[in-house]
From Swiss-Prot:
PANTHER family: NADH-UBIQUINONE OXIDOREDUCTASE CHAIN 5. Core subunit of the mitochondrial membrane respiratory chain NADH dehydrogenase (Complex I) which catalyzes electron transfer from NADH through the respiratory chain, using ubiquinone as an electron acceptor. Essential for the catalytic activity and assembly of complex I. InterPro entries: NADH_DH_su5_C, NADHpl_OxRdtase_5_subgr, ND/Mrp_TM, NU5C-like, Proton_antipo_N. The chain crosses the membrane at residues 4-24, 35-55, 84-104, 121-141, 177-197, 213-233, 241-261, 273-293, 301-320, 325-347, 366-386, 413-433, 457-477, 480-500, 583-603. It catalyses: a ubiquinone + NADH + 5 H(+)(in) = a ubiquinol + NAD(+) + 4 H(+)(out). Belongs to the complex I subunit 5 family. It is a multi-pass membrane protein. This is NADH-ubiquinone oxidoreductase chain 5. It comes from Mammuthus primigenius. Its EC number is 7.1.1.2. Keywords: Electron transport, Extinct organism protein, Membrane, Mitochondrion, Mitochondrion inner membrane, NAD, Respiratory chain, Translocase, Transmembrane, Transmembrane helix, Transport, Ubiquinone.
Length: 603
């Protein structure tokens, strides 16, 4: 085994050690928390070495020493694929999880089950690393389902709250819809290629792969909360803030986009799937950006921004730039985790207040958190020379020079401008102006478990974009010349969004409207989608089921089939065996005539 595979396995083994210690002894002390955090830290440091070796040598590695089973001609083995994608993403996921775990020591310190919470976070990370490094579809599916079940357990962490249980159930059900597409893809490959190994699938490169790739797109739509299967993502904010930070930055929602990137050798020549991915991503990034403009919950605004950025990654995959989408996925992880941790700092200090209208003036009382939110918001909008700029600006430039689907380009540009608008809105309402929270609120930003993770992520949000983009190899011929108006398009729409949002916030800060407009209601209710899918459609289906049950069971079976049918049968049988016809009037008339004739004869 070469150093890359050896050190990668060492980092994975280190992560499993805290899990095995819980099987040997009952960890009810806080030592387990620090053991887990230290294990993630050591795994991060060790994982940097294989990444640096890969950057130097540019040689992939495969580990396939563990044979599992053989079913007829199908050989199943446990194998790891250590290429550019996995070796780049693993240190990022470990670094962010390390920061989130340290933040959780402060945020969740009063939780009586904090040891189990750390165990769940660690399992969440391990399942994502299994997905990233998988070399076959079976192992990928194990990681895929692993992040799904861990997200369910973590979103419903505060299971005493009905909203948390409902949100976890939503996440599970929407992902079950996507999993049908994943299983369909696995079935297609096992029927037509008799293999789940990535090397054999990519080398064979079958021609008609539209059906399995559409199944993969459906799976990614559910996992990455694209339009149609997106309502679970804002609802998932019912979980603790560290869960939201890990779920949105480097685990659950990134799994769908990463799987599409992994299958780019099959997608790059399939125009049907590429166009579907492009249009789906464009609709998602615009729709969620519109919904984020009018939300007042700070966590939901950041959650909808995640969905919008995932749509932007899908657009990038749709224009056949998977490496650029992966770069944006890596850079996005830093500032998105920082935004969630900063919002968690504000929420915790303001006694669980999440409404940005009840904040204000926090730049004076929480300077480090305010700095992190400003830097994270600027990086999210693609401000030059921050982390987001090195991935978002090339995406817009590539889309401008692409020859496919101008409609999707225009929609994406509008969404990029709206990103600047809702980022400005967070800064304006939460950080600036006069304080709007209770005067006796106790705010403390001096805990090192709070400050140190945010500081590390601030550095990552400033510098890591440069290093990641420098080591991303372009796989298409770059444009040597570009018109200036296209070159500065991304910066122009971002500045437009900043300007419009600032002016509107200043103009309407003290205004009150009596009746919301239809567009405002459309945005605040997330396009009526949750109302339609979670209320109207279930009500209609239940009503129809009740009517059918009433008609079939009560009217047909219980009323007509048994009582009325028995009555009809008995009446028919009685009329057949009896000579009485039941004509009472005729009987009385004949009786009357007989009496009358008898009397006349007697007289």
């Amino acid at each position: 085994m070469n150093p890359i595979s050896t050190l990668t396995l060492a980092s994975l083994i280190i992560l499993t050690l805290p899990i095995t210690t819980t099987l040997l002894q009952n960890n009810k002390t806080n030592c387990f928390l620090y053991i887990t955090k230290t294990a993630v830290t050591y795994a991060f440091v060790i994982s940097l070495i294989p990444t640096l070796l890969f950057v130097q040598s540019n040689q992939e590695a495969y580990i396939s020493n563990w044979h599992w089973m053989t079913i007829h001609t199908l050989k199943l083995s446990l194998s790891f694929k250590l290429d550019f994608f996995s070796l780049t993403f693993m240190p990022i996921a470990l670094f962010i999880t390390w920061s989130i775990m340290e933040f959780s020591l402060w945020y969740m310190h009063s939780d009586p089950h904090i040891n189990r919470f750390f165990k769940y976070l660690l399992l969440f990370l391990i399942t994502m690393l299994i997905l990233v490094s998988a070399n076959n579809l079976l192992q990928l599916f194990m990681g895929w389902e692993g992040v799904g079940i861990m997200s369910f357990l973590l979103i419903s962490w505060w299971h005493g709250r009905t909203d948390a249980n409902t949100a976890a159930l939503q996440a599970m059900l929407y992902n079950r819809i996507g999993d049908m597409g994943f299983i369909m893809m696995m079935a297609w490959f096992i029927i037509h290629l008799n293999s789940w190994e990535f090397q054999q699938i990519f080398l064979t490169n079958p021609k008609n792969t539209t059906l399995p790739l559409l199944g993969l797109l459906l799976a990614s739509t559910g996992k990455s909360a694209q339009f149609g299967l997106h309502p679970w993502l804002p609802s998932a904010m019912e979980g603790p803030t560290p869960v939201s930070a890990l779920l949105h930055s480097s685990t659950m929602v990134m799994a769908g986009v990463f799987t599409l990137i992994r299958f780019y050798p099959l997608m790059e020549n399939n125009l049907t799937v590429q166009t579907s991915t492009l249009c789906l991503g464009a609709i998602t990034t615009l729709f969620t950006a519109i919904c984020a403009l009018t939300q007042n919950d700070i966590k939901k605004i950041i959650a909808l921004s995640t969905s919008s950025q995932l749509g932007l990654m899908m657009v990038t995959i749709g224009i056949n730039q998977p490496h650029l989408a992966f770069t944006h996925m890596c850079t996005h992880a830093f500032f998105k985790a920082m935004l969630f941790l900063s919002s968690g700092s504000i929420i915790h200090n303001l006694d669980n207040e999440q409404d940005i209208r009840k904040m204000g003036g926090l730049y004076k009382t929480m300077p480090i958190t305010s700095t992190a939110i400003i830097i994270g918001s600027l990086a999210l909008t693609g401000m030059p020379f921050l982390t987001g700029f090195y991935s978002k600006d090339p995406i817009i430039e590539t889309a401008n020079m692409s020859y496919i689907n101008t409609w999707a380009l225009l929609v994406t540009l509008i969404a990029v401008s709206m990103t600047a608008s809702y980022s400005t809105r967070i800064i304006f309402f939460a950080l600036l102006g006069q304080p709007r929270y209770p005067t006796l609120t106790r705010i403390n930003e001096n805990n090192p478990h709070l400050v140190n993770p945010i500081k590390r992520l601030i550095l990552g949000s400033i510098f890591m974009g440069f290093f990641i983009s420098m080591n991303t190899i372009p796989h298409t011929t770059p444009q040597m010349t570009m018109p200036p108006h296209l070159k500065f398009m991304a910066l122009a729409v971002t500045l437009l969004g900043f300007t419009v949002a600032t002016e509107l916030n200043n103009m309407t800060h003290n205004l009150m409207f009596k009746q919301p407009s239809r567009m405002y209601t459309f945005s605040t209710t997330l396009g009526y989608y949750p109302t339609t899918t979670h209320r109207i459609l279930p009500y209609l289906s239940l009503t129809m089921s009740q009517n059918l049950a009433t008609t079939i069971m009560d009217s047909i079976w219980l009323e007509k089939m048994i009582p009325k049918n028995l009555t009809t049968m008995q009446k028919t049988a009685a009329s057949l065996v009896s000579n009485q016809k039941g004509l009472m009037k005729l009987y009385f008339l004949s009786f009357l005539l007989s009496i009358t004739l008898g009397l006349l004869i007697a007289l």
